[in-house]
Curated annotation (Swiss-Prot):
It is found in: Host nucleus; Host cytoplasm. Residues 1-73 are annotated as: RNA-binding and homodimerization. This is Non-structural protein 1. The gene is NS. Residues 205-237 are annotated as: Disordered. One of its GO terms (cellular component) is host cell nucleus. SUPFAM superfamilies: Ns1 effector domain-like (SSF143021), S15/NS1 RNA-binding domain (SSF47060). It holds the Pfam family Flu_NS1. One of its GO terms (biological process) is symbiont-mediated suppression of host PKR/eIFalpha signaling. Inhibits post-transcriptional processing of cellular pre-mRNA, by binding and inhibiting two cellular proteins that are required for the 3'-end processing of cellular pre-mRNAs: the 30 kDa cleavage and polyadenylation specificity factor/CPSF4 and the poly(A)-binding protein 2/PABPN1. In turn, unprocessed 3' end pre-mRNAs accumulate in the host nucleus and are no longer exported to the cytoplasm. Cellular protein synthesis is thereby shut off very early after virus infection. The lineage of its organism: Viruses, Riboviria, Orthornavirae, Negarnaviricota, Polyploviricotina. Residues 223-230 are annotated as: PABPN1-binding.
Length: 237
């Protein structure tokens, strides 16, 4: 096992413990508490994958952090913080929308890289909007916290969430997972739109219907589907 993987996990465990103490003293805001819950699930998954005990890892992580802080001067710390880019946390959904339980009549689940896509295939002929809570850095989506698909009535019919056992994902991973979700929902004649916030930071552009632009792969797939439909119609005639 890569020692850097182990030490990274140990430090993450200790830093989560520190953040938990902040939350226990009621010093964290809603985004802070949201990330805390998500990171807890991620650490449990990583611990299971690595075969490491979280409590033991937290103690070792504390030693690593204390050693670094002891060796680092205040001036070096100030320079590091000044040069580090700051990320922003953006929210399409309220805490209630993020934490609400939902169920599927015809469940479908697919793993798209480090992300899990879930949707209800029983939903048909609905207008659906995708909302997400995520962090942004350099005006690009950095980390997806949670994405959910809502009908006009407010019902949740789909979701994309990071897999706890596979931490870390890219902007492209998120776009691919959204493509899977949109494709699954549109298969049943639903009309899907993406929130303006998600359009801006995931794609930086969209068409007039609020849809993200199709990738070359998606365009080729659509062209094949259209050609196939045309051939079937000619044979029927």
């Amino acid at each position: 096992m890569d020692p850097n993987t182990v030490s990274s996990f140990q430090v993450d465990c200790f830093l989560w413990h520190v953040r938990k103490q902040v939350a226990d003293q009621e010093l964290g805001d809603a985004p802070f508490l949201d990330r805390l819950r998500r990171d807890q699930k991620s650490l449990k998954g990583r611990g299971s994958t690595l075969g490491l005990d979280i409590e033991t890892a937290t103690c070792v992580g504390k030693q690593i952090v204390e050693r670094i802080l002891k060796e680092e001067s205040d001036e070096a710390l100030k320079m590091t913080m000044a040069s580090a880019p700051a990320s922003r946390y953006l929210t399409d959904m309220t805490i209630e929308e993020m934490s609400r339980d939902w169920f599927m009549l015809m469940p479908k689940q697919k793993v798209a890289g480090p992300l899990c896509v879930r949707m209800d295939q029983a939903i048909m002929d609905k207008n659906i909007i995708l909302k997400a809570n995520f962090s942004v850095i350099f005006d690009r989506l950095e980390t997806l916290i949670l994405l959910r698909a809502f009908t006009e009535e407010g019902a949740i019919v789909g979701e994309i969430s990071p897999l706890p056992s596979l931490p870390g994902h890219t902007n492209e991973d998120v776009k691919n997972a959204i493509g899977v979700l949109i494709g699954g929902l549109e298969w049943n004649d639903n009309t899907v739109r993406v929130s303006k916030t998600l359009q801006r930071f995931a794609w930086r552009s969209s068409n007039e219907n609020g849809r993200p632009p199709l990738t070359p792969k998606q365009k080729r797939k659509m062209a094949r589907a259209i050609r196939s439909e045309v051939r079937r119609n000619k044979m029927a005639d």
